From Swiss-Prot:
PANTHER family with a match to the protein in the record: SERINE HYDROXYMETHYLTRANSFERASE
Biological process terms in GO annotation: glycine biosynthetic process from serine; tetrahydrofolate interconversion
Biological role: Catalyzes the reversible interconversion of serine and glycine with tetrahydrofolate (THF) serving as the one-carbon carrier. This reaction serves as the major source of one-carbon groups required for the biosynthesis of purines, thymidylate, methionine, and other important biomolecules. Also exhibits THF-independent aldolase activity toward beta-hydroxyamino acids, producing glycine and aldehydes, via a retro-aldol mechanism.
Keywords linked to the UniProt accession: Amino-acid biosynthesis, Cytoplasm, One-carbon metabolism, Pyridoxal phosphate, Transferase
InterPro entries xrefs: PyrdxlP-dep_Trfase, PyrdxlP-dep_Trfase_major, PyrdxlP-dep_Trfase_small, Ser_HO-MeTrfase, Ser_HO-MeTrfase-like, Ser_HO-MeTrfase_PLP_BS, SHMT-like_dom
Broad class of the protein's primary localization: cytoplasm
Sites of N6-(pyridoxal phosphate)lysine modification: 229
Alphabetized CDD domains for the sequence: SHMT
GO molecular function: glycine hydroxymethyltransferase activity; pyridoxal phosphate binding
Name by which UniProt lists this protein: Serine hydroxymethyltransferase
Catalytic activity: (6R)-5,10-methylene-5,6,7,8-tetrahydrofolate + glycine + H2O = (6S)-5,6,7,8-tetrahydrofolate + L-serine
Leader sequence residues: none
Family statement: Belongs to the SHMT family.
Length: 420
């Protein structure tokens, strides 16, 4: 029999220890992985609700199971809030992840073997934009575009490539690109070759919702995003469109269910609804503005300390530090900073001489630190600490510098907790 007072701590101490350990890690480490963020307690409350128990195949008002009246309310709330937040005419809140949202879009609008043109993973794209190891590069004929030596998209080169390969779909969006994308220019190129423009805005969705980064919705046929990352919601996916095309909407609905997925995760959809409501609040815009301010402030410190920043700056929440001129690898930098309780991820840089598991750069993102209250003064100090660690990798005093930095990190984490 079930009881309300059941808990993990008494029943499964090994698992509870891991959960508590992760809680301590998040509180005591500075999180700079650009794709991570801290969900609010309200979002986590929804994820732990009784909707965990509910099967609800189908869509609101058209379910294959009974007892879905409250599931319908939850999903419709999420749909309407997503549409309001992004200025969309269509929203599907059921995708379990960003990758599954992308798979549904491909499945809705393409046939196996059709040509897609997406940003290369090595130049800042995503696995699902046509990488050879992904379904997107196996099911479809994937061509890849890149960035210039200066770290920006060359739209003239993209136009030339599009005319040469004649894709059925051009894929916009990125996982490691720090500049503004000209969505109107991408739509213009897509129209010239008769292609769909599909944008994966997962990394900048929160910035777009707050109006601090240009929205692709007025230009793309279809847009997807995750609901975590800059949006700071539960881990999940979302499909949006403002194409005013009922045929596309019908194809997207059928591609999510029953093509790609069965029953939706109603508890996660409930958490998405909370997340979208939070993103509609005035303070959310202030938060996203600070995310960009913090990223720009950190970039300036790295440049002042002699580190190369890809594209020489940032216009969003992330930037890449190119370590080639310092003779460092991304793997070594990631490990050293990790010992100081600063979490980043190794990342390839343009024309990277290292293998993907080694890399020559690190990706730095500010959504999480901003969420816990860091402003320009704190992130400038943090960037300086990071440079101290990087400057001393492989030197006699490396361990001492790391330990001294860790003490500073623990102090500021105590002053600015994730969940006070």
């Amino acid at each position: 029999m079930l009881r309300r007072d059941m808990n993990i701590a008494d029943y499964d101490p090994e698992l509870w220890q891991a959960i508590q350990g992760e809680n301590r890690r998040q509180e005591e480490h500075i999180e700079l992985i650009a794709s991570e963020n801290y969900a609010s307690p309200r979002v986590m409350e929804a994820q732990g609700s009784q909707f965990t128990n509910k099967y609800a195949e189908g869509y609101p008002g058209k379910r294959y199971y009974g007892g879905c009246e409250y599931a319908d309310i939850v999903e419709q709330l999420a749909i309407e809030r997503a549409k309001e937040l992004f200025g969309a005419d269509y929203a599907n809140v059921q995708p379990h992840s960003g990758s599954q949202a992308n798979a549904a879009v491909y499945g809705a609008l393409l046939m196996p073997g059709d040509t897609i043109l997406g940003m290369s993973l090595a130049h800042g794209g995503h696995l699902t934009h046509g990488a050879s190891v992904s379904f997107s590069g196996k099911v479809y004929h994937a061509e890849q575009y890149g960035i210039t030596a200066e770290g920006v998209i060359d739209y003239d080169a993209l136009r030339k490539q599009a005319h040469e390969v004649k894709p059925k779909m051009i894929v916009g969006g990125f996982s490691a690109y720090s500049q503004i994308v000209d969505w109107a220019k991408m739509r213009e190129i897509a129209d010239e070759v008769g292609a769909y423009l599909f944008v994966d805005m997962a990394h900048v969705a929160g910035l777009i919702a707050a109006g601090v980064y240009p929205s692709p919705l007025p230009h793309a046929h279809v847009v997807t995003t995750t609901t975590h990352k800059t949006l700071a919601g539960p881990r999940g996916g979302l499909i949006l469109s403002n194409a005013k095309d009922e045929e596309i909407y019908k194809k997207l609905q059928n591609a999510v269910f029953p093509r790609e997925q069965g029953g939706p995760l109603v508890h996660i959809i409930a958490a998405k609804a909370v997340c979208f409501k939070e993103a509609l609040e005035p303070e959310y815009k202030v938060y996203q503005q600070q995310v960009v301010k913090n990223a720009k402030a950190m970039v300036e410190v790295f440049k002042q300390r002699g580190y190369n920043v890809v594209s020489n700056g940032t216009e969003n929440h992330l930037f890449l530090v190119d370590l080639v001129s310092h003779g460092l690898t991304g793997k070594a930098a990631d490990a050293a900073l990790g010992k100081a309780n600063i979490t980043v991820n190794k990342n390839a840089v343009p024309n990277d001489p290292q293998k993907p598991f080694i890399t020559s750069g690190i990706r730095v993102g500010t959504p999480s630190v901003t969420r816990r209250g860091f402003k320009e003064a704190e992130v400038r100090e943090l960037a300086g600490w990071m440079c101290d660690v990087l400057d001393n990798i492989g030197k006699d005093n490396e361990a001492a510098v790391i330990e001294a930095t860790k003490v500073k990190v623990l102090d500021i984490c105590k002053r600015l907790p994730v969940y006070p």
